[in-house]
Amino acid sequence: MYKKTLFTLSLSFVVLFAAAQEVRQMSLQEATDYALEHNQNILNAKLDIEVAEGVVKENIATGLPQINANLDLAYNFSLPVSFLPSEFIPGAPPGEQVAVAFGTKYSGNASVGASQMVFDGVFFVGLEAAKTYKELSTKKHIKSKIDVVEAVSKAYYAVLVNKLTLELVEKNYGRLDTLLQETKEMYQNGFAEKIDVSRVQVQFNNIKVNRENSTKMLGVAESLLKFQLGMPINEEIALTDELTLDIFDDAKEGSFGYEQRVEYSILQTQERLALLDIKRTKVEYLPKLDLYASLGAIAGTGSGANLFNIGNEWFDFGLAGVKMSVPVFDGLRKHRVLQQKKVKLQQVHNNYDLLENSINLEIEQKQVAYENSVKTMNVQLENMKLSQEVYEITKEKYQAGVGSNLEVINADADYKQAQTNFFIALYNALIAKVDYKKSIGNLL
């Protein structure tokens, strides 16, 4: 009894917990805002900006003082020899070279060295290039945001269209179910033939399968939307926007300039990077100037233990200086490199014309596709209304005994086909709207 009660309480808790999970309400704007915070591509693009910031700091660090400490303790188990004339060695035979070992069995060297760059043109150009690279990463982040907004918008519209399709399929299901029951009654009363019932039954079976398929397609569309949002698939959402024909009125607002396209802005940054790359090669012709200093102590002894006798065995040393490096001739290497980078800059300039022509063509194509899709949608909407009228009139005639069952079946098939054509046209118009707004840089 106790176990049964415990199981009942546990089950009740699970039910209450599931009921407590709220369904997330989302408009299209809320969906895009959510995606811009949670989509994995956006998160990776943000990390790229952090990497670029790290590159800037890394370049700054190379211009700061560099300090290093060194400690070297050695056991010279076999000292190298040098050859000296015998005149320097008392008691050695004259005219000969005498091998003499210099050094101690144990030696030590401890030092601290510091250096400071005073002038290096490559450093300053590299620092500027690193900041420009960060700017490029930021613009690529914007491009990722545009791509995500595009994907989310299309997925959001797909859910709305599939939802409307399912609602209409449900109405068709109820309508055909009613027609089937009426036809069966007419058959039982002798006012219809068996073939009339079979025809309606075929249509009813088809709409039953269509309803199941539409339900599954709506689930797939919702899963795709959650994927684009960066949301767990098992989280429940409800879309709050509704599809009306007014949604197509704002797609062609405003004027267009190439700067509105993030690809154009990215190309401008790439041009600056190419110019800085040329500048970097040019400054390699300039001298480099560095300051340096070192302070330490050395020791040499015949006993390893004496190396740790800092007071008596170690002797201080120190130095400071300035170092200038002047490039004189490198076999024309920098000249050849400079020519290559100028060619690459010319390629970037050519890409301006290529990108502008590509944008112009894309806008023209997307605008025509959008206008045509809206016209097609309006025509299919009118066809759907007309086919509905035809079906209703045909059904009334059949119920009044002046029409045939076959006419009703054909009118029903035409009506459902008109519905399918309209929803396909509606979805195509929505996608074309998103594509056109992206082409004119008005999506984000």
Locations of regions flagged by a protein language model:
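Bacterial Sec-dependent N-terminal signal peptides
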Residues: 1-28, 36-39, 423, 429, ...
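Bacterial Sec-pathway N-terminal export signals of envelope proteins
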Residues: 20-72, 78, 233, 239-275, ...
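Small/polar, glycine/serine/threonine/aspartate-rich low-complexity segments that form flexible
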Residues: 22-23, 70-112, 242-247, 292-326
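Sec/SRP-type N-terminal targeting helices
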Residues: 43-47, 60, 107, 118-145, ...
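Periplasmic alpha-helical coiled-coil/stalk elements that build and connect Gram-negative outer-membrane
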Residues: 54, 147-258, 373
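Outer-membrane beta-barrel architecture
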Residues: 57, 113, 277-280, 323
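Short segments within alpha-helical structural elements
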Residues: 61, 206-231, 385-442
